[in-house]
Amino acid sequence: MKDNPEAVSERLWALSCGPCLRVKFSAACKINGVRYSIVDQEKFMLTQNSGVMTEGSHNDQDIDFYGVLKEVIELQYNSNLQARRTVVQFRCDWFNQEGKTRGLRDDGHFKTIHISSYWYKTDPFILASQAKKIFYLQDTSFGKDW
């Protein structure tokens, strides 16, 4: 590519061609050594692996988005049969953080979030590499859904 500045890398070419038509959906995955599973799978388990957090912006402010994992989606980008390139995306339900009756409360030690209302329903996707794993516990001091 140094000899020919107009040449495009194999990776960029594969991405520009778009993903393959087949998409793989999974109930769980392991990203950077961290195990994630969809929230529907946790109904039958004692462990919790669906809590996710990612950094983003809302109304021109940087915030942390908190949610639960709904789907693990693996897209394949192949420009030839020898190379298998995949991108893993998470579809999440993001908890609404606006308003006085719902939102996020931070006491300096723990963050408490109201879990009965969602937002960004039309923008639910993040790259799996952007996710940070978090755990949710019921906060009895604020009542139901906190």
What is each of the regions a protein language model found here?
Residues M1-W146:
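Terminal interaction-prone segments of large eukaryotic proteins
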